[in-house]
A protein has these predicted regions:
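Transmembrane alpha-helical interface segments in multi-pass membrane proteins
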Residues: 6-9, 19, 27-73, 77, ...
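Short cytosolic juxtamembrane segments of multi-pass membrane proteins
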Residues: 107-120
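Loop-to-helix entry region at the N-terminal start of transmembrane alpha-helices
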Residues: 1-8, 82, 86
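Amphipathic alpha-helical repeat scaffolds
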Residues: 13-16
Length: 120
């Protein structure tokens, strides 16, 4: 249960950060829309950005988790237990978190009116 709450917190935090990115890049988004980029292309670029951030975070989390497990096992003189599928779980959860957190900001970015956004 705690892990679900932490995942929800991670999605909300990442979505807030992505939303702020969309707000800061509103002129760029408006310019892309004005020169003919489709709403789907704008949406896709932000979802891809979220996916890349999520996979990077999942990879770093896996590396830090494995190093921590190895250090604690070495200090306690326990045999380390590191199932290889945990890397895949970390990558999948990171990717899912990145995509989920990018959906709403991507939708907001794709709905911006270019004329209003360029004016400021």
């Amino acid at each position: 249960m705690l892990s679900l709450v932490l995942m929800l917190l991670a999605v909300i935090t990442a979505a807030s950060a992505m939303y702020l990115t969309v707000q800061n890049r509103s002129e760029e988004i408006a310019l892309r829309r004005a020169i003919g980029s489709s709403r789907w292309l704008i949406c896709r670029s932000f979802i891809l950005e979220g996916l890349i951030v999520g996979i990077t975070a999942g990879s770093l989390g896996g590396i830090i988790g494995n190093l921590t497990t190895l250090c604690v096992s070495w200090i306690q003189t326990w045999p380390p237990v590191l199932p290889p599928e945990l890397w895949l779980v970390g990558l999948f959860l990171g990717a899912a978190t990145g995509i989920l957190s990018a959906i709403y900001p991507a939708w907001v970015a794709s709905r911006k009116d270019p004329a209003i956004a360029i004016r400021g």
